[in-house]
Amino acid sequence: MATPWGAVFFLLMIACAGSTVFYREQQTWFEGVFLSSMCPANVSASTFYGIMFDAGSTGTRIHVYTFVQKAAGQLPFLEGEIFDSVKPGLSAFADQPKQGAQTVHALLEVAKDSIPRSHWKRTPVVLKATAGLRLLPEQKAQALLLEVEEIFKMSPFLVPDDSVSIMDGSYEGILAWVTVNFLTGQLHGHSQETMGTLDLGGASTQITFLPQFSKTLEQTPRDYLTSFEMFNSTFKLYTHSYLGFGLKAARLATLGALETEGTDGHTFRSACLPRWLEAEWIFGGVKYQYGGNQEGEMGFEPCYAEVLRVVQGKLHQPEEIRGSSFYAFSYYYDRAADTHLIDYEKGGVLKVEDFERKAREVCDNLESFTSGSPFLCMDLSYITALLKDGFGFADGTLLQLTKKVNNIETGWPGGHLSPAAVSGHLQLRLSVPLETCTSELLFTGRRGLGHFLQLRWRKPGLKPIDWLY
């Protein structure tokens, strides 16, 4: 999906000062979870590392984390992050899995350059794929993952069981919500005055919030709800991931490309594009020819009618979100920054209606379009339709668009991420001292998000156990 949280991605570091226990309302939530052992061979070593790959729909990103423990028995802290990325994403190599895995192999050189050779054998390496691979036929997705796993096994790093897997979309939303509300201090105490999160990736989109009214819980599909405990409080979240509703997947749906068998010799046209435009676009390894309506309508109203068909009646609309405020990131942030609705570095606060206003401005001036993305009108119109007619937000709903919370990155643009280093003293609470092994330090990542998070998950009928995802 978005990633690209990856979106998502920010890479996030969150520290949980106690166990986090999840209770899912259905038995099958995600696959490929695993335990990781980040135990240094020499338990007195003060520095250790972790490698996370985020395989998003538009690119693959590597994050190399450095942790330091200043004294035995003390909590380790995050000292820094090294980031790099390649495009296109793994899904573009659906028919060439070995070639796709080579993009991961190239990024492993970043890890080798960043981590002392003496630490290689005890540094775990993990790859989590998101919506891009979820959209592929299972056989092709698994072929890619198997090739990546072989690359990992040939590397000098520690390869945990199930180190390569596809992340469940809803988990992306949960991680984003926990991260933002933890970093803003909203999870401390018992007020539960939290903010919801919206993440828009390339292939999927997530919405997550803490319902305040029992009516919302009663009217919500059971598999949209997740309960967990943190800081002696219980949180029952509304969270759902919509596969195929990411920004770039929505372009294909708007163009009608998803309903057409074969793309050779076919040009997909839209009222959302400049009339004179004739171009090609590659997404998911497929080349699409597209252009404007040479004789037909053009502008906001006909464009909005096209994107409305993509979302109308297809998303659940919890009534209480109309009066709530949300954090929004990934492509929400990008398109707002691209059109100067917010400052690119600082972000800002918008109302839902601001996206519509900018969409009208851009779409009704397509004749004078000269630079930037030819999809800008379509993207802004889709974001407007997704927020208003998809999720059911009110025009006046406030959205906090941000890349960082307390100087920790929470999201990044899918596809054009730049190297970043995150420094700080975010302490991680380990359930056991480092000298007895940090097996409960969970190494997790998402499209836009990556986290190290101590987490305990319980499926119905099972005892709480420690998962790594």
Swiss-Prot record:
Q: Which residues are glycosylated?
A: 232
For activity, the cofactor(s) needed are: Ca(2+); Mg(2+)
Q: Tell me which UniProt keywords the record has, alphabetically.
A: Calcium, Disulfide bond, Endoplasmic reticulum, Glycoprotein, Hydrolase, Magnesium, Proto-oncogene, Secreted, Signal
Name its pathway: Protein modification; protein glycosylation
Query: Where found, per UniProt?
Result: Endoplasmic reticulum; Secreted
User: What catalytic reaction does the record list?
Assistant: a ribonucleoside 5'-diphosphate + H2O = a ribonucleoside 5'-phosphate + phosphate + H(+); GDP + H2O = GMP + phosphate + H(+); UDP + H2O = UMP + phosphate + H(+); IDP + H2O = IMP + phosphate + H(+)
Tell me, which GO biological process terms does this entry list? 'de novo' post-translational protein folding; protein N-linked glycosylation; UDP catabolic process; UDP-alpha-D-glucose metabolic process
Major localization class: endoplasmic reticulum
Claim: Ligase is one of the keywords in the record:
no
Question: Which CDD domains does the entry link to?
Answer: ASKHA_NBD_NTPDase5 (cd24114)
Principal EC category: hydrolase
Tell me which positions the record assigns to the signal sequence. 1-24
Write down the superkingdom of origin: Eukaryota
Checking InterPro entries in the record gives:
GDA1_CD39_NTPase
User: Which organs or tissues contain this protein?
Assistant: Expressed in fetal cells and most adult tissues.
Q: How does it assemble?
A: Monomer; active form. Homodimer; disulfide-linked. Homodimers are enzymatically inactive.
**Family, similarity comment:** Belongs to the GDA1/CD39 NTPase family.
Q: What does this protein do?
A: Hydrolyzes nucleoside diphosphates with a preference for GDP, IDP and UDP compared to ADP and CDP. In the lumen of the endoplasmic reticulum, hydrolyzes UDP that acts as an end-product feedback inhibitor of the UDP-Glc:glycoprotein glucosyltransferases. UMP can be transported back by an UDP-sugar antiporter to the cytosol where it is consumed to regenerate UDP-glucose. Therefore, it positively regulates protein reglucosylation by clearing UDP from the ER lumen and by promoting the regeneration of UDP-glucose.
Q: What else is known?
A: ENTPD5 has transforming capacity and tumorigenic potential.
Name of the featured protein:
Ectonucleoside triphosphate diphosphohydrolase 5
Question: In which organism is this protein found?
Answer: Mesocricetus auratus (Golden hamster)
Q: Which gene encodes it?
A: ENTPD5
